[in-house]
């Protein structure tokens, strides 16, 4: 059985109004193709901020896959979804595919200044 490793940024720091705000992710997640992957990102009162998620494949620039907690940019498959509540934001990949193997990074910013 094949496994899809999803490597995660251990810490992510954001600029602007939440400079030095620390986000913590688990080191890695592995799932079988077709299964659901849930990748978490934790930070103090993260639910009061907007969370976004980037996917980065080797040798490529990061691609935004989720913004404002749960919105998908044009061209991002519906299998990518996001949520954010309390101290945890979650990126969910339903029905993972081999092409989803990548690094995933979370980022946060103050929702009161994001408009």
Curated annotation (Swiss-Prot):
Q: Where is this region: Complementarity-determining-1?
A: 42-50
| Intrachain disulfide bonds | 41-106
Q: Which residue intervals define the domain Ig-like in the entry?
A: 21-115
User: Which GO molecular-function terms appear in the entry?
Assistant: antigen binding
Stretch list, region Framework-3? 71-106
Q: Positions of the region Framework-1?
A: 20-41
Pfam families cross-referenced by the UniProt entry: V-set
Q: Where the protein is mainly located, per its record?
A: secreted
List the residue ranges of the region (Complementarity-determining-2): 68-70
What biological processes does GO assign it? adaptive immune response; immune response
- Keywords, ordered alphabetically: Adaptive immunity, Cell membrane, Disulfide bond, Immunity, Immunoglobulin, Immunoglobulin domain, Membrane, Secreted, Signal
Record keywords: Membrane included?
yes
Q: Which domain of life is it from?
A: Eukaryota
- The segments labelled Complementarity-determining-3 in the record are 107-115
Region Framework-2, as annotated, extends over 51-67
Q: Where in the cell is the protein located?
A: Secreted; Cell membrane
Q: Name one GO cellular component term.
A: immunoglobulin complex
Segment forming the signal sequence: 1-20
Question: Among its keywords, does the record have Cell wall biogenesis/degradation?
Answer: no
User: What does this gene product do?
Assistant: V region of the variable domain of immunoglobulin light chains that participates in the antigen recognition. Immunoglobulins, also known as antibodies, are membrane-bound or secreted glycoproteins produced by B lymphocytes. In the recognition phase of humoral immunity, the membrane-bound immunoglobulins serve as receptors which, upon binding of a specific antigen, trigger the clonal expansion and differentiation of B lymphocytes into immunoglobulins-secreting plasma cells.
Q: How does it assemble?
A: Immunoglobulins are composed of two identical heavy chains and two identical light chains; disulfide-linked.
Q: Which PANTHER family match?
A: IMMUNOGLOBULIN LIGHT CHAIN
Record's protein name: Immunoglobulin lambda variable 3-1
What organism, scientifically named, is this protein from? Homo sapiens
């Amino acid at each position: 059985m094949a496994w899809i490793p999803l490597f995660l940024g251990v810490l992510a720091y954001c600029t602007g109004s939440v400079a030095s705000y620390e986000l913590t992710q688990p080191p890695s997640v592995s799932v079988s193709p077709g299964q659901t992957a849930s990748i978490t990102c934790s930070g103090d009162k993260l639910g009061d901020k907007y969370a976004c998620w980037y996917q980065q494949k080797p040798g490529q620039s990061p691609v935004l896959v989720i913004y404002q907690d749960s919105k998908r940019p044009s061209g991002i498959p519906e299998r990518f979804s996001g949520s954010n509540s309390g101290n945890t934001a979650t990126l969910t990949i339903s029905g993972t595919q081999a092409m989803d193997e990548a690094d995933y990074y979370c980022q946060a910013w103050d929702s009161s200044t994001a408009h």
